[in-house]
Amino acid sequence: MQDKNNLCWLDMEMTGLNPETDRIIEVAMIITDSDLNVLAQSEVYAVHQSDDVLNKMDEWNTATHGRTGLTQRVRESSHTEAEVEQKLLDFMSEWVPGRATPMCGNSIHQDRRFMVKYMPKLENYFHYRNLDVSTLKELAKRWNPPVAKSVVKRGSHKALDDILESIEEMRHYREHFLISAPRAEAQ
């Protein structure tokens, strides 16, 4: 099942944007082939954090994660960051050899910053490159605004939904923004 051309898509929800003071509270992964066909998806993991950590969330995170039910799921979860890291490593290694896939998603550098701090073995399994859909979004805004405006975002702020939305957005840019030439077999 391992294929070096498979892509691993990831999304995390965090208590805030600063890995020095905030923590991971939800994470999920999806594996696609190089044509963006979904091959597998991980479990969606709510990562337990203490009330002390959750009570430090700002207004936006408190409201958003409260509305989605994530805050309650985090309180009820028994999954630690280390346990989730190992489960995701096990899942990922079934589909992709180590350091083969870029980390794929939207604003994925932010997830990577948290991974370096709280899930370093998982971060190390990825290639050092990122496939960041938000880069295409920023380019489309500047070079082809109608393409950028035609992307429909739901913004649920749930890890699995956000990954699926990122894959769909990448498909959109592939079809409407990237120039397609006859495809040679990947080497």
From Swiss-Prot:
Q: Which GO molecular function terms does the record list? A: 3'-5'-RNA exonuclease activity; nucleic acid binding
Could you tell me which residue ranges the Exonuclease domain spans? 7-170
Q: Which domain of life is it from?
A: Bacteria
EC code: 3.1.15.-
Q: Where does this polypeptide localize?
A: Cytoplasm
**From which organism does this entry originate?**
Neisseria meningitidis serogroup B (strain ATCC BAA-335 / MC58)
Q: Which GO terms describe its cellular component?
A: cytoplasm
Is Mitochondrion set as a keyword in this record? no
Show the SUPFAM superfamilies listed in the entry. Ribonuclease H-like (SSF53098)
PANTHER family per the UniProt record, alphabetical: OLIGORIBONUCLEASE, MITOCHONDRIAL (PTHR11046:SF0)
Quote the function comment for this protein: 3'-to-5' exoribonuclease specific for small oligoribonucleotides.
Family recorded in the similarity comment: Belongs to the oligoribonuclease family.
Give the keywords, sorted: Cytoplasm, Exonuclease, Hydrolase, Nuclease
- Active site annotated at which positions? 128
Q: Which GO terms describe its biological process?
A: DNA metabolic process
Q: What is this protein called?
A: Oligoribonuclease
Short name of any one Pfam family annotated for the protein: RNase_T
Report the gene name: orn
InterPro entries hit by this protein: Exonuclease_RNaseT/DNA_pol3, Oligoribonuclease, RNaseH-like_sf, RNaseH_sf
